[in-house]
Regions:
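N-terminal donor/sugar-recognition subdomains of glycan-related enzymes
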Residues: 1-233, 239-240
Length: 240
């Protein structure tokens, strides 16, 4: 069994049958005409006459470090673009779930032909989302409603796989981002929370952390002002 067949089999096991069937139908009736992949796993785009990676190793390492720094200890991450799947494979060990969004069927085919993601697909660690799938909204609602995801939806951010996607797929990347935000708001609303308020509170927390860390520690306030006043009023907001 080839790597591609193993990956498709994993998708067809119930992980993402629509995508599995779409890939199976493609390899049975078509061939990749726009993209190809070389022995170094660099992908060539015949339409724009460019390679996906100018320096494959450096670029993958840069985005690997950049995404990890911004999602330290996050239970999940969302990335637009499967690329050659090396970045996805490397990042998967750091998260409970990794959601990968892609619009090009040929890029799914090429990536899944060279990198074995079957174990991660079977376990749910990696989920491949075809944003051209007509039922993608339903898929995302189910995924984002999982308990180990729904509790952390305010952490959501869409990252991009590499510079190539930023340059040639900006509109589709934003479409995927809007798709996720729309479904996240539905999930949070169904949980009884105000999604806009949730995102706003998280934004305020990040903005105020520097000043909070620089503020006078509460124990120091007590030691400096003990017995100097008859009454004290403590004003606090948010979780303590």
């Amino acid at each position: 069994m080839t790597i591609l067949e193993k990956n498709i089999q994993a998708l067809l096991s119930g992980v993402n049958e629509p995508l599995g069937n779409k890939l199976l139908n493609f390899i049975q009736n078509k061939t990749c005409s726009r993209f190809n992949i070389d022995e170094n796993l660099n992908i060539y785009d015949k339409t724009h006459n460019v390679f996906m990676y100018e320096n494959l190793e450096e670029e993958i390492n840069f985005f690997y470090q950049s995404i990890l720094e911004k999602t330290h200890r996050y239970p999940f991450a969302c990335i637009y673009g499967i690329g050659n799947a090396l970045l996805i494979k490397n990042l998967s060990k750091h998260y409970k779930h990794l959601f990968i969004f892609e619009s090009e069927i040929e890029l799914f085919i090429l990536a899944l032909s060279v990198i074995d993601l079957s174990e991660e697909l079977y376990s749910g660690k990696i989920y491949l989302a075809d944003i051209e799938e007509e039922r993608v909204d339903i898929q995302l609602l189910i995924l984002f409603d999982m308990k180990d995801i729904s509790e952390y939806l305010s952490l959501y951010e869409m990252f991009v796989n590499n510079v190539y996607y930023k340059k040639f797929y900006e509109d589709i990347w934003h479409k995927a981002d809007e798709l996720c935000e729309k479904n996240i708001k539905v999930v949070i609303r169904n949980l009884g929370s105000n999604s806009d308020l949730s995102f706003e509170c998280y934004s305020h927390l990040l903005q105020n952390i520097p000043s909070m860390l620089e503020s006078i520690p509460f124990q120091r306030i007590l030691s400096e002002r003990k017995n100097k006043f008859d009454n004290t009023i403590v004003v606090s907001a948010g979780p303590s």
